[in-house]
Swiss-Prot record:
Entries under HAMAP family matching the protein: tRNA_thiouridyl_MnmA
Active site annotation, chain numbering: C98, C194
Function: Catalyzes the 2-thiolation of uridine at the wobble position (U34) of tRNA, leading to the formation of s(2)U34.
InterPro entries documented for this protein: MnmA-like, MnmA-like_C, MnmA-like_central, MnmA-like_central_sf, Rossmann-like_a/b/a_fold
UniProt entry tagged with the keyword Transferase: yes
GO biological process, one term: tRNA wobble position uridine thiolation
PANTHER family per the UniProt record, alphabetical: MITOCHONDRIAL TRNA-SPECIFIC 2-THIOURIDYLASE 1, TRNA 5-METHYLAMINOMETHYL-2-THIOURIDYLATE -METHYLTRANSFERASE
Protein name: tRNA-specific 2-thiouridylase MnmA
Native species: Chlorobium phaeovibrioides (strain DSM 265 / 1930) (Prosthecochloris vibrioformis (strain DSM 265))
Localization per record: Cytoplasm
Length: 357
């Protein structure tokens, strides 16, 4: 019975999570909200605290909301990861790590403390229990689909998760927000990384890592033949596919094609030099299927806005896999996620560690 089921909903202060909570109230669940703090002082009280956060101006959708300060964990597991990835010449995706280690971990821990049966978020994705497994699917609104960011979730998290917005488009969510009396109904969305002001990660790294100048120095910028065409200011400030800010004039557009931290060298080339047919991913997490033993056909995405592309997936030892695309992909980037799909279903994913042209 829904009336006897308590759902703890992650409340961010935005429209999506508020609507998710109101939908669950509307469906008859007992709903509690949890606002996870990640940018407060790590020394402040880490225990659950009552919050004055209101998700709706209508009395029937007023729910108790608690806050949980996970700033210390966020600094270690997300910000620390973000910095170290750039120092290792990889391009991180902090939102994926945050979903796994902060949002779902925090929700499930708080659910135990509050005796909640399930957890929910406002992500645009959906789940279904089929064949003895909880399966993860893309959201119906393909422009907003966030399944790419959820590939690290495992059965223990998904089996306790409800994703109410999975069948809705963003305009429908805003319309529901108005009908539910959600104050954030017209709130604009932020596309920035929450801890990087102005989305300027270069300036952030300079300010956040005191000894960055000692750990990273300028080096050579070379073309496809190895000829020095300029100098870079430090490899963490560059990413694969970058064209702007290279400081070299060759008479034609050039792009960062690879980063060599060992020799402190940035390699550049033409746009066609960015094309690759194959990647290797590590840390594979299989959601919709048992860890495969044989190659199989699927589609894969190599970045959030990427369209799923037909490929062949070959499992390897040590929880790795090779993904061979049927047509070349541009700017496959180490550190980003490769997420594997069958139609709309997320089969699994991993972190890109190597590419092959």
């Amino acid at each position: 019975m829904k009336q006897e089921t308590t759902v703890l909903v992650g409340i961010s202060g935005g429209v999506d999570s508020a609507v998710a909570a109101c939908m669950l109230v509307d469906e008859g669940y007992r709903v509690i909200g949890l606002n996870i703090k990640v940018l407060d002082s790590p020394e402040s009280n880490p225990a659950l605290q009552p919050s004055s956060l209101v998700i709706s101006n209508r009395e029937e959708f007023r729910i108790p909301v608690y806050t949980l300060n996970l700033s210390k964990r966020f600094r270690e597991d997300v910000i620390g990861y973000f910095q170290e990835e750039y120092l290792a010449a990889r391009t991180p995706n902090p939102c994926i790590v945050c979903n796994k280690k902060i949002k779902w971990a925090g929700l499930l821990e708080a659910a135990d403390m509050l005796n909640a049966d399930l957890v929910a978020t406002g992500h645009y994705a959906s789940t279904a229990f089929l064949g003895g497994r909880c399966r993860l699917y893309q959201g119906a609104d393909k422009k907003k689909d966030q399944s790419y960011f959820l590939w690290m979730l495992q059965q223990k998290e998904l089996l306790k998760t409800i994703l109410p917005l999975g069948t809705l488009a963003k305009p429908e969510v805003r319309e529901l927000a108005r009908s539910y009396g959600v104050p954030a109904a017209e709130k604009k969305e932020s596309q920035e990384i929450c801890f990087v002001p102005g989305d300027d990660y270069c300036r952030y790294l300079e300010q956040a890592i005191p000894d960055l100048a000692e750990r990273v120095r300028g080096g050579e910028l070379v073309d496809a033949s190895g000829r020095v065409i300029g100098h870079h200011r430090g490899y963490p400030f560059y990413t694969i596919g970058q064209r702007r800010g290279l400081g070299a004039s060759t008479g034609e557009p050039i792009y960062v094609t690879s980063i060599d931290p060992v020799h402190n060298r940035i390699h550049t080339g033409k746009k066609t030099d960015l094309l690759s047919r194959e990647l290797t991913a590590s840390g594979m997490n299989w959601i919709g299927i048992e860890p495969p033993k044989k190659p199989f056909e699927a589609t894969a995405r190599i970045r959030y806005r990427d369209a799923p592309t037909p490929c062949r997936v070959t499992p390897l030892e040590d929880n790795r896999a090779t993904i061979s695309f049927h047509s070349p992909k541009s700017a496959i980037t180490r550190g980003q996620a490769a997420v594997i799909y069958r139609d709309d279903e997320v089969l699994g994913g991993g972190s890109i560690v190597e590419t092959t042209q």
